[in-house]
């Protein structure tokens, strides 16, 4: 006995993530189902792409972050707040990559109050900087769903009818402290066509279920960090637009970036309109994007002109939104033993070892599950189909 190497007994070990130790055999014993749930969620998201459906391409989204004392719990590492802010940094980057003509804002609720961390804006750098600074935020008190939703609604209700109005709530607490009847507010949100979705970090809460159901949103409770990221990814694609939403042509301007040098005699320094309501000190600059209608200057696109209201974008912004309207068809799932072709993934060239493979119905090339998800979530086009297109003559 003395010669046995020292090792921690099961009853001496920590209780961290004990649910992942469970296994299930063919007789029906217990098993860790986390990976299976994540796998099914990935595949479900591939099949959920809305083809031939009106989508809210111009999105206005407020993210409400719970800042109550429950965010200091350490079931997510290092704690719920830090994990949430890190995942939101990823979410903001991906959101603007897939929705370049949309805007986002962040609200924090704690101590029965709500305050804006960032205003609605199309500038991802500003949001990411604010999220990095919020890591040092003190979590205390209870959240207030009522105050948070009221604050978001005050801005969203003035958005044009052809845009999507959304709120995503990251809810850690099991309680909410509200100054009035929240069910009356839910009716107001529904009338204003504001879609509210909730991601719970603790357990299902009745008021969140009603809130999501009545406004047409979704409500999920996370299993672990990976599932948390999957649920956030679910909100990157634009939701289907309601049949009652306005359908009209939208005037847009496509300003070119003008660069002037100090040696240019005709160059006139000017202020950027984007600095009017910002915290940064306005400064005189020579170059920028000039609105083709009123000549107001802006530092970056996309933006809505503060003078004439014209939406200013660039052509690549519209091109990157195009894939949502015509999504790539889902690949066919086939058991590996029934597949007679080469046992290598066409995307990563790795050996196919999973129980199922995924075949493109057009080019008949086979992919592993990771490449399948990557193709549908990021590339939005099949590599095999692209390679089969003949090159133009003379190239």
From Swiss-Prot:
Keyword 4Fe-4S: no
Biological process annotations from GO: DNA-templated transcription; nucleotide-excision repair; regulation of transcription by RNA polymerase II
Residues found modified as Phosphotyrosine: 95
Localization annotation: Nucleus
Protein name: General transcription factor IIH subunit 2-like protein
NCBIfam families found in the cross-reference section: ssl1
Function: Component of the core-TFIIH basal transcription factor involved in nucleotide excision repair (NER) of DNA and, when complexed to CAK, in RNA transcription by RNA polymerase II.
Family: Belongs to the GTF2H2 family.
Gene3D superfamilies, sorted: von Willebrand factor, type A domain, Zinc/RING finger domain, C3HC4 (zinc finger)
GO molecular function terms attached to this record: zinc ion binding
Keyword Zinc belongs to the record: yes
Major subcellular location class: nucleus
């Amino acid at each position: 006995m003395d010669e046995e190497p020292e090792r921690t007994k099961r009853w001496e070990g920590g209780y961290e993530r004990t649910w992942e130790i469970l296994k299930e055999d063919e007789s029906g014993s217990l098993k860790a189902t986390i990976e299976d749930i994540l796998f099914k969620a990935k595949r479900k998201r591939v099949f959920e792409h809305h083809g031939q459906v009106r989508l809210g391409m111009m999105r206005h989204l407020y993210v409400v972050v719970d800042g109550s004392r429950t965010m200091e719990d350490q079931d997510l590492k290092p704690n719920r707040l830090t994990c949430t802010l890190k995942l939101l940094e990823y979410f903001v980057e991906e959101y603007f990559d897939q929705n370049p003509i949309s805007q986002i804002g962040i609200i924090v609720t704690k101590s029965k109050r709500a305050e804006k961390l960032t205003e609605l804006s199309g500038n991802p750098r500003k949001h990411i900087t604010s999220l990095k600074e919020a890591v040092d935020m003190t979590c205390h008190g209870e959240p207030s769903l009522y105050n948070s939703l009221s604050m978001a609604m005050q801005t969203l209700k003035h958005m044009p009818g052809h845009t999507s109005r959304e709120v995503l709530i990251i809810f850690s607490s099991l309680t909410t402290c509200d100054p009035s009847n929240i069910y009356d507010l839910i009716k107001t949100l529904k009338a204003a066509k504001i879609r509210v979705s909730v991601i719970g970090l603790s357990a299902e809460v009745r008021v969140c279920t009603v809130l999501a159901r009545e406004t047409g949103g979704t409500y999920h409770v996370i299993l672990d960090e990976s599932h948390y990221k999957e649920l956030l990814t679910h909100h990157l694609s634009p939701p289907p637009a309601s049949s009652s939403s306005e359908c009209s042509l939208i005037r847009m301007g496509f300003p070119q970036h003008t660069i002037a040098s100090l040696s240019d005699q005709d160059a006139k320094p000017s202020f950027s309109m984007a600095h009017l309501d910002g915290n940064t000190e306005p400064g005189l600059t020579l170059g920028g994007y000039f609105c083709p209608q009123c000549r107001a200057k802006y530092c970056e696109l996309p933006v809505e002109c503060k003078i004439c209201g014209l939406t200013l974008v660039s052509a690549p912004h519209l091109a990157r939104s195009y894939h949502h309207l015509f999504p790539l068809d889902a690949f066919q799932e086939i058991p590996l033993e029934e597949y007679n072709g080469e046992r290598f993934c066409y995307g990563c060239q790795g050996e196919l070892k999973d129980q199922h493979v995924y075949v493109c119905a057009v080019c008949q090339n086979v992919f592993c599950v990771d490449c399948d998800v990557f193709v549908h979530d990021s590339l939005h086009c099949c590599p095999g189909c692209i390679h089969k297109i003949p090159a133009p003559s003379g190239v």
